[in-house]
């Protein structure tokens, strides 16, 4: 991990420190940073819960202990950094108290683990008491609900912050294989030579989850799969898979290339999209009985530029599918049917598969000859085995935010472009197709790939059933 050069933060202020994200992710990431001696500032929590610092420390330990074996010395160092302010974040008087607690800190990082509707009010209140002059502000997705709301949110943030002060957190951008994509593509000539329309015939991106909306019914019913994962996670991954090489190492160099991809994509065609909903979804607490919210979405898109013109890209994501897996699959073009080949029949196309979750890794599928038939051979690499223990996404993102490294965060123009791309599907969502839990989604999704390779069974870790 690199220092972004903007100066390290001397205070971390977490709005919503008693919330679900802090319990599941943030405290664990802070603990791991402390363990690796990468945490070097006080932590001030802000939330509406009336609790003491001692109660916050106890709650933090319980949160970390859910997934980590706690080293008392490490935790004691982390606990010593914690302080707490309780109050209503919409009350301007809270920010006077906050200013007193911040004191002489000159480069705070404000991490807003709050509902998106509170982002702008919090930032505007911070500006009113002059707490933003050298600060950075991290905001969690979703960044808006549609194109219009994203434009409004960005305008309100930019009225009091420079773009270099805003960190838009999408945890997918902190995942090891997503970070590695740039290096895999451009540092390996064997891959770089194949990575265009001349060698690749189509691209599939799958994000499957083997669970439902659980206790998030009310939230999810207002969002759906398109907003929840496609507009952000999967389009960001698509950009990294297809972008041109950056001309330098800065965050803007990387984000410029991602933005070029988005600009080359037309708004999605509702006729090339299939929406699904698993049976039983409307029985979940918080979900409307007549809900037409999608828990599954599959779509086709293309990138109209020199490298990718004519290459179809298929994206699917859904809940209550047979397995939990996220992967990118690239199909290479077939070799011709030549006389020496078995039965003069060409082999199946080679495939390059990048598994993002779980057990990140890379697979090259090639063909071999056995007797008078073809056989697929899989050349597999596990990043955990070959590269060592991965840095967890929130650990990576928190550290990047603290040192001012913007490479792992989404930029304003990319957010607006991705909303532009999906907006037609929000305006004209179309029919909802029901599907059984444990299936790979509605049958109608197969029609998107007519004349192409069809949805493939994902590459699952050894011993995983689907």
From Swiss-Prot:
Active site residues per record: 233
Binding-site residues, NADP(+): 48, 88-89, 141
Example of a GO cellular component annotation carried by this entry: cytosol
GO molecular function, one term: NADP binding
Keywords for the protein's UniProt record, in alphabetical order: Carbohydrate metabolism, Glucose metabolism, NADP, Oxidoreductase
Pfam families tied to this protein: G6PD_C, G6PD_N
Reactions catalysed according to its record: D-glucose 6-phosphate + NADP(+) = 6-phospho-D-glucono-1,5-lactone + NADPH + H(+)
An example Gene Ontology biological process: pentose-phosphate shunt, oxidative branch
Metabolic or biological pathway, per its Swiss-Prot or TrEMBL entry: Carbohydrate degradation; pentose phosphate pathway; D-ribulose 5-phosphate from D-glucose 6-phosphate (oxidative stage): step 1/3
Its EC number(s): 1.1.1.49
Binding site for substrate: 171, 175, 209, 228, 319, 324
Family annotation (InterPro entries): G6P_DH, G6P_DH_AS, G6P_DH_C, G6P_DH_NAD-bd, NAD(P)-bd_dom_sf
Biological function: Catalyzes the oxidation of glucose 6-phosphate to 6-phosphogluconolactone.
Matches recorded under NCBIfam families: PRK12853.1-3 (NF009492), zwf (TIGR00871)
Family: Belongs to the glucose-6-phosphate dehydrogenase family.
Stored PANTHER family: GLUCOSE-6-PHOSPHATE 1-DEHYDROGENASE (PTHR23429:SF0), GLUCOSE-6-PHOSPHATE 1-DEHYDROGENASE G6PD (PTHR23429)
Protein's name according to its UniProt entry: Glucose-6-phosphate 1-dehydrogenase 1
Species name: Mycobacterium tuberculosis (strain CDC 1551 / Oshkosh)
């Amino acid at each position: 991990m690199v220092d972004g050069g903007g100066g390290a933060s001397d205070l971390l202020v977490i709005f919503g420190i008693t919330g679900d994200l802090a319990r599941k992710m943030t405290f664990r990431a802070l603990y791991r940073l402390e363990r690796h001696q990468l945490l070097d500032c006080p932590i001030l929590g802000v939330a509406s819960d009336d609790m003491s610092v001692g109660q916050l420390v106890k709650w933090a330990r319980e949160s970390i202990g859910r997934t980590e074996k706690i080293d008392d010395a490490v935790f004691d160092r982390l606990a010593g950094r914690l302080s707490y302010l309780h109050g209503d974040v919409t009350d301007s008087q809270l920010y006077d108290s906050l200013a007193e607690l911040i004191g002489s800190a000159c480069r705070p990082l404000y991490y807003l683990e709050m509902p998106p509707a509170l982002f702008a009010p919090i930032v505007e209140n911070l500006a009113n008491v002059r707490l933003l002059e050298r600060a950075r502000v991290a905001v969690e997705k979703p960044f808006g609900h549609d194109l219009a709301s994203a434009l409004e949110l960005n305008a309100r943030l930019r009225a009091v912050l420079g773009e270099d002060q805003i960190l838009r957190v999408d945890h997918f951008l902190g995942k090891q294989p997503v970070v590695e994509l740039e290096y895999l593509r451009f540092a390996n000539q064997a891959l770089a030579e194949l990575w265009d329309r001349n060698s690749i015939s189509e691209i599939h991106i799958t994000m499957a989850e083997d669970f439902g909306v659980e206790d998030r019914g009310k939230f999810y019913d207002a969002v759906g799969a398109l907003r929840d994962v496609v507009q952000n996670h999967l389009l960001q991954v698509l950009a990294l898979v297809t972008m041109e090489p950056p001309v330098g190492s800065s965050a803007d160099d990387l984000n410029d290339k991602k933005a070029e991809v988005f600009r080359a994509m037309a708004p999605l065609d509702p006729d090339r999209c299939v929406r699904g909903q698993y049976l039983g979804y409307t029985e979940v607490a918080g979900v409307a009985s007549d809900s037409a919210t999608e828990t599954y979405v599959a779509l086709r898109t293309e990138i109209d530029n020199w490298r990718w013109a004519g290459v179809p890209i298929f994206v699917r994501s859904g809940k209550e599918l047979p397995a939990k897996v996220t992967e990118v699959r690239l199909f290479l073009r077939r070799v011709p049917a030549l006389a020496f080949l078995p039965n003069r029949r060409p082999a199946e196309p080679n495939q390059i598969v990048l598994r993002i979750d779980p057990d990140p890794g890379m697979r090259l599928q090639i063909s071999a000859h056995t007797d008078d038939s073809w056989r697929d051979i899989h050349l597999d690499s596990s990043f955990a085995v070959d590269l060592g223990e991965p840095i967890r996404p929130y650990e990576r993102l928190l550290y990047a935010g603290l040192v001012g490294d913007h490479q792992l965060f989404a930029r304003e123009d990319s957010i607006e472009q991705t909303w532009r791309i999906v907006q037609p599907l929000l305006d004209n969502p179309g029919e909802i197709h029901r599907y059984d839990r444990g299936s790979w989604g509605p049958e109608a999704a197969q029609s998107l790939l007519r004349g192409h390779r069809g949805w493939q069974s994902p590459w699952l870790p050894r011993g995983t059933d689907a």
